[in-house]
């Protein structure tokens, strides 16, 4: 009896601890969801031209069509012309795409966490993870991850508000802080702060507890990591432009200094990011194409922006105009090819890993390949049968026409008037 009472007390204590962990996690998740919704609402409010509200459109950071020659500390000074050249930055459409794409991905993250909370609330899931309530919720997102995500989205909202008031230097500084926080958020969300072997074992153990939980922390989580990687890649490239914006509006620089700074910063961050993806994050999510897709999108945006910028302000470059233009195209082209090669290497290594381990994903891929080959064979056979049938029909038609021509030839022979001669 005493042992049974002790077990009941332990059970109640564990259930109470799990209840507290669940409530704390739910509060953090709700705060994260509210922050994301408020950020999306701020974007919409800052995009609408109203008499009351934000003074300016937040995405109109630079306008290359007009050059301001009165202000001195809002751009790059060009001594020979006595004017001011706008700083290299994404134009309005690219800025709108970046912020709204980020908000949409974070809305998906909120939906993912919400579904995870519903699945974790099942009785058999709670019974299986009795005494480790914090662990079951960390399978979706740990409390630290949610906290970093909330701070990151709040800082990005502050960037939107500051941009709407045209405080460019403050916006760049806040964005760089946002970049540092979302980097930690991205790392914790991808790996949960555990070793890759532990990560795989946790996913595998969830298969015997609940199938929906296993799919959520396995396949669905991998999809969310890929979506977040797309956005983070563009965030990384945007950080180099914000860094150039901060330098250009804080110090006296020449025209080409900011362009070179942006290219060098982007190149260094891209190299570090590719190495981290290949040797660290790929241990958790093997097929992580989102990072490369995001980099290609970001480099495409940067390439078009840089080309337009250099073409518009060609006069301000002086004798180094052609060299700077060639350097911009060369650096961006080399890194675009490097990103494509890294993506091919990742695909090859992922396929070799799944083939060596004979995983379910590899089995599904092989089954899909066999189905495609079978369908192609069926199409070829049907095409050959149709071809043979058409040839038979053509031959039959030709034979019938030949017989008809012979009959016509016979009936065309008429009597010429004599008994021995027939005229055609």
Swiss-Prot record:
Ranges facing Intravirion side: 1-23, 116-143, 188-226, 283, 349-424
Main location: virion
Annotated family: Belongs to the herpesviridae glycoprotein M family.
Keyword Membrane: yes
Pfam families: Herpes_glycop (PF01528)
Virion surface topological domain residue ranges: 45-94, 165-166, 248-261, 305-327
Protein name in the entry: Envelope glycoprotein M
Keywords, in A-Z order: Disulfide bond, Glycoprotein, Host endosome, Host Golgi apparatus, Host membrane, Host nucleus, Membrane, Transmembrane, Transmembrane helix, Viral envelope protein, Virion
Transcription regulation is among the record's keywords: no
Membrane topology: Multi-pass membrane protein
InterPro entries hit by this protein: Herpes_glycop_M
Region: Disordered, residue numbers: 382-424
TM spans (from-to): 24-44, 95-115, 144-164, 167-187, 227-247, 262-282, 284-304, 328-348
Biological role: Envelope glycoprotein important for virion assembly and egress. Plays a role in the correct incorporation of gH-gL into virion membrane. Directs the glycoprotein N (gN) to the host trans-Golgi network.
Organism expressing this protein natively: Gallid herpesvirus 2 (strain Chicken/Md5/ATCC VR-987) (GaHV-2)
Assembly behavior: Interacts (via N-terminus) with gN (via N-terminus). The gM-gN heterodimer forms the gCII complex.
GO cellular component: host cell endosome membrane; host cell Golgi apparatus; host cell nuclear inner membrane; membrane; viral envelope; virion membrane
Subcellular location: Virion membrane; Host Golgi apparatus, Host trans-Golgi network; Host endosome membrane; Host nucleus inner membrane
Domain of life: Viruses
């Amino acid at each position: 009896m005493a042992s049974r009472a002790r077990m009941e007390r332990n059970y109640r204590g564990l259930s109470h601890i799990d209840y507290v962990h669940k409530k704390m996690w739910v509060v953090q998740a709700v705060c994260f969801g509210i922050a994301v919704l408020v950020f999306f609402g701020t974007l919409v409010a800052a995009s609408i031209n109203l008499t009351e509200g934000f003074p300016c459109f937040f995405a109109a950071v630079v306008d290359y069509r007009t050059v301001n020659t009165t202000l001195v500390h809002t751009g790059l000074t060009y001594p020979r012309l006595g004017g001011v050249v706008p700083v290299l930055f994404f134009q309005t459409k690219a800025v709108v795409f970046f912020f709204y794409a980020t908000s949409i991905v974070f809305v998906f993250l909120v939906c993912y966490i919400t579904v995870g909370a519903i699945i974790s609330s099942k009785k058999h899931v709670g019974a299986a993870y009795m005494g480790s309530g914090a662990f079951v919720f960390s399978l979706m997102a740990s409390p630290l991850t949610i906290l970093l995500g909330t701070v990151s989205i709040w800082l990005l909202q502050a960037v939107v508000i500051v941009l709407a008031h045209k405080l460019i230097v403050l916006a760049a500084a806040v964005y760089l802080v946002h970049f540092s926080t979302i980097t930690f958020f991205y790392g914790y969300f991808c790996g949960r702060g555990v070793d890759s072997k532990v990560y795989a074992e946790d996913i595998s153990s969830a298969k015997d507890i609940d199938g929906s939980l296993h799919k959520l922390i396995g396949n669905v989580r991998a999809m969310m990591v890929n979506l977040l990687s797309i956005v983070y890649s563009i965030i990384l490239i945007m950080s180099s432009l914000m860094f150039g914006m901060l330098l250009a509006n804080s110090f006296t620089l020449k025209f080409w200094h900011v362009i070179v700074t942006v290219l060098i910063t982007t190149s260094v961050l891209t190299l570090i990011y590719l190495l981290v993806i290949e040797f660290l994050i790929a241990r958790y999510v093997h097929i992580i194409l989102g990072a490369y897709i995001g980099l290609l999108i970001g480099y495409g945006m940067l390439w078009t922006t840089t080309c337009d910028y250099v073409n518009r302000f060609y006069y301000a470059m002086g004798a180094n105009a052609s060299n700077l233009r060639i350097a911009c195209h060369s650096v961006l082209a080399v890194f675009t090819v490097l990103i494509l090669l890294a993506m091919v290497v990742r695909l090859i290594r992922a396929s070799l890993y799944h083939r060596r381990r004979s995983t379910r994903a590899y089995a599904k891929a092989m089954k899909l390949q066999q189905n495609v080959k079978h369908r192609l064979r069926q199409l070829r056979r049907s095409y050959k049968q149709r071809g043979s049938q058409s040839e038979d029909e053509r031959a039959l038609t030709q034979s019938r026409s030949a017989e008809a021509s012979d009959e016509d030839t016979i009936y065309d022979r008429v009597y010429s008037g004599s008994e021995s001669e027939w005229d055609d």
